[in-house]
From Swiss-Prot:
Residues 353-532 form the VWFA domain. The keyword Signal applies. The keyword Cell cycle does not apply. PANTHER family: VON WILLEBRAND FACTOR A DOMAIN-CONTAINING PROTEIN 5B1 (PTHR46299:SF1), VON WILLEBRAND FACTOR A DOMAIN-CONTAINING PROTEIN 5B2-RELATED (PTHR46299). It comes from the Eukaryota. Residues 1-18 form the signal peptide. Keywords: Glycoprotein, Phosphoprotein, Secreted, Signal. This is von Willebrand factor A domain-containing protein 5B1. One of its GO terms (cellular component) is extracellular region. It is found in: Secreted. Residues 595-674, 934-953, 964-999, 1100-1121 are annotated as: Disordered. The lineage of its organism: Eukaryota, Metazoa, Chordata, Craniata, Vertebrata.
Amino acid sequence: MPGLLNCLTGAALPLMESDVTSYVSGYALGLTASLTYGNLEAQPFQGLFVYPIDEYSTVVGFEAVIADRVVTIQLRDKAKLDRSHLDIQPATVTGNFPEEESPIAPGKVTLDEDLERVLFVVNLGTIAPMENVTVFISTSSELPTLPSGAVRVLLPAICAPTVPPSCTHRFGSSSPQPQGKDPHCFGTQTKDSYNRLCLATLLDTKVTNPMEYEFKFQLEIRGPCLLAGVESPTHEIRADAAPSAHSAKSIIITLAKKHTFDRPVEILLHPSEPHMPHVLVEKGDMTLGEYDQHLKGKADFIRGTKKDNSAERKTEVIRKRLHKDIPHHSVIMLNFCPDLQSVQPNPRKAHGEFIFLIDRSNSMSKTNIQCIKEAMLVALKSLMPACFFNIIGFGSTFKAVFASSRIYNEENLTMACDCIQRMQADMGGTNMLSPLKWVLRQPLRRGHPRLLFLITDGSVNNTGKVLELVRNHASSTRCYSFGIGPTVCYRLVKGLASVSKGSAEFLMEGERLQPKMVKSLKKAMAPVLSDVTVEWVFPETTEALISPVSTSSLFPGERLMGYGIVCDASLYISNSRSDKRRKYGMLHTQESSSSVFYPSQDEGLSPGSGNCAKNVNQGQTKDAHPCNGDSPTHHGLDVSRRRRAYSTNQISSHKTCPRATTASDPTGTARRYPLRKAKVQDLASESDWESQKWQTDLQTLLNEGHNLSQGPKLHGPGARRPSLLPQGCQLMRFFDQKPQAWGPVRELDCGASRTSAPNSQSSEDLAIEPAHCPSTFERETSLDLEPMAESEEQANPCRTATPSPVVGKALVKGLCANQRMQWEVSFELEPPALKRGDTQNADMWSETFHHLAARAIIREFEHLAEREDEIELGSNRRYQVNAVHTSKACSVISKYTAFVPVDINKRQYLPTVVKYPNSGAMLSFRNLTRQWGGSSAGLGRPQSMLREHSSAAGDSKFQTLALQDSPTSTFNKTPSPGHEKQTTAEGPPQNLSASAPSSMKATETLFGSKLNLNKSRLLTRATKGFLSKSLPKASEATPGSQSSDYIPLVSLQLASGAFLLNEAFCTTIQIPMEKLKWTSPFSCLRMSLVTRRQDLKTQSPQDCTSLSSSPPSCDGISLKSEESSDQESNAMLEHMGKLWATVVALAWLEHSSANYIIEWELVAAKASSWVEKQKVPEGRTLSTLKNTARQLFVLLRHWDEKLEFNMLCYNPNYV
């Protein structure tokens, strides 16, 4: 159970008091909790604080008060921790109990690639007996939304744990056993010592407290628009006006009654404009003058402008260091939740790329494989013709039906069904990482979100790597996972769905997979906004850093959050025009390849760029409407003189979006985080770790009146959030500079030099910069540099003293049902004042947007680093360095940095107890040389190779696509996933059996060949295995055998949704062809039966007279007419046969398999949709056709009294 743990026993200390103060603005949540724990043991112990973090939160501050000690944390570069004797080394253990070959030192725990994202772990040192510990922790989070547009605030369980009705165990006893059932991921060992404690178990336990505790809760709401209501489904709440509120947009929520301790605390906010985009603004912590002086003291700015002091050069340097100066600039946040509830679901318009990953390892039993076969057949028949699909089986290696996802048509569907029918569990162990890498590196298809369906019954020993891989592609891929049997890894299955916003399903013994599969398919086929992008427009005098930069898709209830770090560069641009507009963003272009973001040339929209943008007034959004790329564009703002910042994260909506421009509280511009802003003396290192102590000057904090023994103040004037130790506390001195006692933060006078503590770097980093892009990787030392006294750096005398407000616009675009949609919202960004006002008060929440924006920017750099590393080993260093810079500057963790605990009173670092995975950051030259030495010389980075293997058991339709280390080119020129050594977990390395050209040619021939076989014959062969079984009648079938009653019929359905009227169809539904045709409402079908009989026997004169006297017509044309051709007659008969067979199939499903409607409802909906689009011949109507099919079973009851009549009113609109 998370919380404050005893290292020796793993037991959680009881919570005595919880005081939660939180703040919501738009979709952003700032939360600070004061948690007091009591040590009821008679013996001291080593304390460990464990705090779970969700996918959209980050820890931004931490302090712990233990008696007279204060423990905080500091962000450190993982690559430098070894050099600093912090004993943090790379690890390959992935959250399970450590393997024998990689032992963990006593008192150590491991975090794999996934756990370090979702767990915050801090060593608090020794806790004395009967001592209380108060922990202050601050987080910034992105809030989820509901389909109605409501914003959901759910308090973390660790801040408000439930209290069981009856607590029988004593305090201090060993922690309760985890609720999970996953022995593979969570282990079954007893936690008799801390070094054997598996932190993954903490995520699977319910957070409880053995007794009631004092609970306080306060939520301040600052909405971008008026609130339509605030409610809590769990508690009675009270709403009061905030003391500083200027309108009804700001209120304070508290609990009206005492907390009951039996449920979580949940608050729902209902905005008055729930489905309109809003832009909110949070100012930086520097004025224009302060930032000017800040720049003049930076080494990269001095070097960059030493030879070239032009305005263009200055703005270029500012642009390259924007990620380092995020706290100093204003941050804009875009919030948007589209209204998809009003979109009428249309299964036939369900677009997507459906990829099925099936575990075919030897652990799959014969029963499980048969269950998967039937479920996969139903799933494939439930897909719509507009989508793409592929099937991949994996074990030690993996095999795919197609080289890439193919369009859903008859030929591809028949081939896939044939492969599924012959699928067996014969592929060895379980290697999930390689097939996932192969899938995720495939190019995305426009308008088709990638939907991954993964079925497994086991576990892997690299769970962290698998989850982190899917997390990195969560913007483009959504995973629906299925766990079969008791041995499945619960953490793996749940994690895959959680990190990608999918869903997880588990099957116990005896359960059916089809209902759960169809349930997930229906979620995936819901209305979706794909290819969502955001385009920002700013004046020419503005530099911006934008996130996100990748396309995404939004399903019902999901929201979009975009960020922009905006820098006013008007002081550095001569003769600038505030009305001139340009577009720029963080995309890959050729224009500023060395910059952290990539501006485009000054340009406006072309006349044919679309008519989506209408006239926009200040502070008003426009209606969402389709865009026509061939129509002219008219903007209220001069677009030809604007600059656009693109973020390839789009969105589309269907409702009007008028709203007034909103910004965050203008009083929130004072300095934040006194602890972080206070400059601290360098920490001196000694050779012996146990005796290392660092002299730290905390007089600054004491002078400012902060009582460290009491912790931060959370309420009233002067309230503050806990913080991190400043980055000025370095382990090494720079050059031979003697340590100095840094004074308190002071206002800078004009001409004074300034060095930002978060940007302080060691001189060692300057020596290892890549030579190809020095300006991007310049890192400052802690040595204060005198600014260059140059008159050219003064502001233009012609410029006005008070800059005008920055007017910008955000354009949100996306695709919905192949229709392009767009919204736009304008906003006003007031520039920072030239002089800081004296009346501004501190705001403890004034960095929330900055934290979330920094987190988003860090993730972008991490993704870019991984992408570059796939292309060439070591080429990703520039993005790793940028991620570390941003992490340290904003006190937001990244995968390349780690939290290190610091005991301020003892003036020393606490021993870290966490063993981190190898992040790959800042690889040394020796490591690079060693890794490059393993590859072929002169051929660059090893790439992935597409291979073909002979398949066993006649499974010739599955092609093996194994990722291999080979110096040859990749399949379809797609770069392979990150360079990694092949181990048993990821499949054994295999030798190439043929040269690259021959292998690629064979692959193209195999996959590129088209089937020219007859569709009816293929379908009959695909269902041969089902039809060969005896089909019991409905009245005679047992509950266990009824599961396959409808499977043979479903297997005959065409990709379009229709059924063919042939012998296979008649055999499946057990109705003779003669009876089907005689009961048909189409005279042509009945006449064809008569004609056939006449061909079989000699006709009598009476029969000839009867036929000639009343000849039936087919759409007004006689079957015996000489003008009608045989081809037209056959086509008409085939069309009528399809119509009749399809409605009969629907009636048969309703009659004979009503108990399984949940499983075949998508199949029936597709068939019904196909019928409704057809033109019914002979003047018949669709209702007549369906009624006749239902009456068929009434007639059959007279013909066969054993048939049970079970009419079900099926409505495809309910699907």
